[in-house]
Amino acid sequence: MAELPRLNNIIRALEAGQHALTCFAPAHTDSAVAMSASKYDGCVFEMEHNPWDSGRLRDCLQYMLNRAQIAKAGLVPPVNPLVRIPVNGVEMAQ
């Protein structure tokens, strides 16, 4: 069976012994659009220190999609999204 290509640019860079470059961005749609066109391997949406808003996260992930890039590169996203989420447990009081 042929080996499937990595869909995650961060893992692909690390496996090749390269540096994976990511940035932190606020979870807003304008940030998502800007990050989707950037040269970073990944983007970390900072949602840890804000009230949890799954709708805002959904919008950010949707705005990172670019139909032209999908048609050109297939399923491999140019920038992989990561999300810092708020804690949910005993550690909230620390």
Name each model feature, range by range:
Residues 1-94:
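Expand to "…catalyze enediolate/carbanion chemistry for C-C bond making/breaking, isomerization
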